[in-house]
């Protein structure tokens, strides 16, 4: 075609438009269709040349004659040059720069795009789109970074305009911010902060839970995006936020264990000081739980090697025979395990030692010989705990001091996860309100040590008092004692003196008084032999008591006699009679369930039973025809 008729002076522009057509991609050609700029702005002219290679559309975008120009471009078969004046030399130089280095044009575009929003004068949809783009660009330059916010910024730009060129322009502006001069609003510090940001902020990822969705527009969500690897150029508020987030990676990792570590010592010190128990329970529970807690806390503070080696060597300790504590380092593992089983002491010995210690710390050599288990426990306690213990002992009255003779502190050394060797019975929610030892397992630690017996009242386990605890709570405390390598159990043996003295201070006098009554009346009991006829209904009476009953270990006795029993049999068997032998089988030490199994296994016919009948009936037991 001949271009010389109309565009002889415009031939360079035709060639320039061809260059522009080759240089720019379709995305760049569609990039600024919705962004009207001033005709004197170089970027607007450049954008017009980009968007329309024929040159006519660039002029008509600024003058508002778009429909007419497009009709000319589509209807004519001859390309016409734009009806504009020749462009200055600097514009051609910029085009040459575009050929040589394409990223520089992007930087100039980002730099020249900043002052353009102030020169907009045309209303309408393009103006609204351009104003929204300006807000997005300013917020993008202020708060965004290279990786995740690109998606959120592209979503924001796509909501404002459907042009794909606007979504592609935002990452290019981010690249142009590094080379932008004074026209870039805080771009250099932003990019400087974005460099170390991927290394600093990923540990602060816990803050992402507080950040909102990145697709929501507005400044508050963008201010919360520093947790999502974003950072602001404003150094005052967000630098402090960054400082708190930099402490964040160690905060959550260290904070949670520290909270747990704080909770356990607080619970131990509370049980050691016994402030709640001093108000609600007796002084006896206070002193026993204090000793248990202090000893357990001291054992946990010792290393495992020292706790296994130091404790058995410091005693000569109490209940176990002296052969169990061999100090020969070449002893066998069996002897070492025997030495690690346990040791026990009486609180009365500990009281005597603390009284002597309050007068003179190095005196009382005779006590050193007689109460070596007490010394081993005292050596475990810190000075503060020992002072508290001495103060508690001084406050106790004589009646309470006598009760210390029946209280024993047992320290069991075991493996992690191993049981203590006994079970519990009773609870505040059961008929028997007192927590007692239900059963001592034959091969357990408690059986090997020998201090803990069936029927003993359990005052505390590892510093946790069982006063007023329900049965499930007591079992939970017993299960928790499996984890440590040591266990401290404070028990009390019911005695005759303890039953009368503890009646006012504790609620456990019931089981102790019953046991003491049995011991007194057993001396005055008479033994008799009777023969009963066993039928399909049994022997005609029910049983109560037995090993591991609700009231502790008690002998098997006749509870009540069923109706329909022969008169001669009802006279021979009375409620409260203790069954000693049944068909040649000893009934001592059996549970009620085991005794019933023996009775059920008997064939029908005559059965010989040896009974022990008390001449003085217990309180509350009817005397049905004493002989």
UniProtKB/Swiss-Prot annotation:
Positions of the UniProt region annotated as Interaction with PPP1R12A, PPP1R12B and PPP1R12C: 402-498
GO molecular function: cytokine activity
SMART domains hit by this protein: PDZ (SM00228)
All copies of domain PDZ, residue ranges: 408-493, 529-614
Keyword Transcription (UniProt): yes
Described purpose of this protein according to its UniProt entry: Interleukin-16 stimulates a migratory response in CD4+ lymphocytes, monocytes, and eosinophils. Primes CD4+ T-cells for IL-2 and IL-15 responsiveness. Also induces T-lymphocyte expression of interleukin 2 receptor. Ligand for CD4.
Basic and acidic residues composition-biased segments: 169-178
Subunit structure: Homotetramer. Pro-interleukin-16 interacts (via PDZ 2 domain) with PPP1R12A, PPP1R12B and PPP1R12C. Pro-interleukin-16 interacts with GRIN2A. Pro-interleukin-16 interacts with GABPB1. Pro-interleukin-16 interacts (via PDZ 3 domain) with HDAC3.
The gene coding this protein: IL16
GO biological process, one term: induction of positive chemotaxis
Keyword Ribosomal protein (UniProt): no
Polar residues biased stretches: 129-145, 206-215, 328-341
Ranges of biased composition (kind: Low complexity): 154-168, 231-242
Protein known as: Pro-interleukin-16
CDD domains: PDZ6_PDZD2-PDZ3_hPro-IL-16-like, PDZ7_PDZD2-PDZ4_hPro-IL-16-like
One Gene Ontology term, aspect cellular component: extracellular space
Keyword annotations of the record: Chemotaxis, Cytokine, Cytoplasm, Nucleus, Repeat, Secreted, Transcription, Transcription regulation
Superkingdom: Eukaryota
Region named Disordered: 38-270, 319-341
């Amino acid at each position: 075609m001949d271009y010389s008729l109309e565009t002889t002076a415009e031939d360079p522009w035709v060639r320039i438009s061809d260059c522009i057509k080759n240089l720019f991609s379709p995305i760049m050609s569609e990039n600024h269709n919705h962004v009207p700029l001033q005709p004197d702005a170089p970027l607007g002219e450049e954008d017009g040349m980009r968007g329309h290679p024929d040159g006519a559309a660039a002029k008509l975008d600024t003058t508002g004659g778009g429909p007419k120009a497009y009709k000319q471009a589509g209807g004519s078969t001859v390309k016409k040059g734009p009806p504009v004046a020749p462009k200055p030399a600097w514009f051609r130089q910029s085009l040459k720069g575009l050929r040589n280095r394409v990223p520089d044009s992007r930087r100039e575009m980002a730099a020249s795009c900043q002052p353009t929003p102030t020169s907009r004068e045309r209303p309408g949809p393009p103006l609204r789109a351009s104003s929204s783009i300006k807000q997005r660009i300013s917020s993008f330059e202020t708060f965004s970074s290279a990786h995740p916010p690109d998606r959120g910024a592209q979503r924001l730009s796509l909501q404002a305009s459907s042009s794909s060129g606007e979504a592609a322009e935002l990452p290019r502006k981010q690249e142009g911010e590094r080379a932008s001069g004074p026209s870039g609003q805080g771009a250099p510090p932003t990019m400087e902060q974005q460099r170390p940001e991927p290394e600093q902020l990923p540990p602060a990822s816990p803050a992402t839970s507080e950040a909102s969705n990145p697709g929501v527009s507005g400044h508050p969500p963008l201010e919360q995006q520093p947790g999502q690897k974003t950072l602001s150029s404003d150094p005052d508020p967000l630098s402090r936020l960054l400082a708190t987030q930099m402490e964040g990676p160690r905060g959550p990792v260290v904070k949670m264990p520290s909270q747990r570590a704080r909770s356990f010592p607080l619970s131990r010190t509370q049980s050691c000081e016994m402030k709640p128990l001093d108000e609600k329970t007796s002084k006896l529970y206070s002193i026993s739980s204090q000793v248990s807690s202090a000893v357990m806390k001291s054992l946990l503070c010792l290393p495992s090697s020292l706790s296994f080696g130091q404790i058995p060597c410091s005693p000569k300790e109490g209940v176990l025979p002296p052969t169990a504590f061999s100090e020969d380092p070449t002893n066998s593992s069996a002897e070492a395990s025997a030495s690690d089983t346990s040791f026990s002491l009486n609180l009365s010995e500990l009281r005597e030692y603390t009284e002597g210690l309050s007068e003179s710390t190095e005196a009382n050599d005779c006590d050193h010989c007689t109460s070596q288990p007490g010394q081993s426990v005292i050596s475990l306690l810190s000075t503060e705990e020992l002072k508290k213990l001495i103060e508690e002992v001084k406050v106790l009255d004589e009646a309470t001091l006598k009760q210390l003779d029946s209280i024993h502190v047992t320290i069991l050394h075991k493996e992690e996860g191993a049981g203590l060797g006994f079970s519990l019975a009773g609870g505040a929610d059961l008929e028997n309100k007192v927590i007692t030892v239900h059963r001592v397992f034959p091969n357990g630690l408690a059986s090997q040590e020998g201090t803990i017996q069936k029927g003993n009242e359990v005052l505390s386990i590892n510093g946790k008092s069982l006063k007023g605890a329900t049965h499930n709570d007591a079992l939970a405390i017993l299960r928790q004692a499996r984890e440590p390598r040591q266990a401290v159990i404070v028990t009390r043996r019911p005695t005759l003196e303890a039953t009368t003295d503890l009646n006012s201070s504790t609620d456990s006098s019931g089981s102790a008084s019953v046991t003491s009554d049995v011991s007194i009346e057993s001396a005055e009991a008479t033994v008799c032999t009777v023969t009963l006829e066993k039928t399909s209904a049994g022997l005609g009476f029910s049983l109560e008591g037995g090993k591991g009953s609700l009231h502790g270990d008690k002998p098997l006795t006749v509870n009540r006699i069923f109706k329909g029993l022969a008169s001669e049999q009802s006279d021979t068997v009375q409620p409260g009679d203790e069954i000693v032998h049944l068909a040649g089988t000893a009934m001592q030490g059996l549970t009620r369930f085991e005794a019933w199994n023996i009775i059920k296994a008997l064939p029908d016919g005559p059965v010989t039973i040896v009974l022990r009948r008390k001449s003085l009936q217990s309180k509350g037991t009817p005397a049905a025809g004493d002989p």
